[in-house]
Amino acid sequence: MGGNQARDGEWTRPSSMRAVRLHGGDGAGRLELDTVSVPDLGAGESLVRVHAAAITRDELEWPVDRLPAIPSYEASGVVVEVAEGLDGLEIGDEVYGLTPFDRDGAAAEYVAVPAALLAPRPRSVTHPESAAVPLAALSAWQGLFVHGGLAAGERVLIHGAAGGVGQFATQLAREHGAHVVGTASGEAVARARALGADEVIDVGVARFEDVVEPVDLVFDTAGGDPLTRSPSVLREGGRLVSVAEEPPHGPPTITATYFVVEPSREQLLELTRLVDKGNLVPAVDSVFPLAEARSAFERVQESGKHGKVVLLVHE
């Protein structure tokens, strides 16, 4: 389907583009920089010229049924074309968002995205910093507020408080007026404190359930043994929410929820506001050019990262 394009002299739709594509299920070694067609627009879609695309640790395992596939589901860029009859987005808008997981992603010069999933990006930060927000920050928002029902004044325990999702959860819970208890270890203990946690438990030194006072909400970002042990620290009527794996069933007086993050324009708008106010700070670990996507995906598997690994597509 055709669309409304940028004004004459500003942009001409190319027939092809560079895109990173996964050609097999063996990880970063099966990534290739290919020349492919620029995607056509469906109803309600916009074409975004990608400036930066963030990547996630396990995402190369997601598209095994539709290879070759373009990875990266977080984009920051500029709208260059909109579908006929589409309202709400204009050519030249700087936007960011979480793209659908069941189609090609943003590790390319252009990506077609349903306009309802895009929002104006935070203009106080760079495109790579904008791209670092959607997946992790939406996961944090939905875990705390949509599934966790966190209210001001409540106590929340965040497992992995300085990690990819945890760093946003710590900042959002603090901004919301909750009492934030975080778990971390090593250098991440100091980072969790700097993010605004009221208390930080060094799990390399103590078991969290031995030292934490009862909490209203546990938000788990990593799964495993800490999640299994979490019901014991919840107050009656407490909530256990995990974005990592199905939580254990605790006493009938608590609720346990596992969720998968969903795109949300409304939530992105609020995240943009918080970033531009300086109340939510995205972290970027490293930036790689599109041609070095293999190195970027190898970096995302390494330990010791602080923040997102991002592909820079256009300056």
What are these regions, as identified by a protein language model?
Residues R103, T221-A283, L312-E315:
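Glycine-rich phosphate-binding loop and adjacent beta-alpha segment
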Residues G2, A131-V205:
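Mid-domain Rossmann-like dinucleotide-binding core that forms the NAD(H)/NADP(H) cofactor-binding site
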Residues S37-A54, W62-D102:
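Glycine-rich beta-strand-centered segment in the early N-terminal region that forms part
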Residues E61, L98-G160:
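NAD(P)H dinucleotide-binding glycine-rich loop of Rossmann-like/cofactor-binding domains
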Residues V80, V181-T183, V241:
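Conserved beta-strand positions in the Rossmann-like core of class I SAM-dependent methyltransferases
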Residues G3-S15, L268-E315:
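C-terminal hydrophobic helical "lid"/dimerization subdomain
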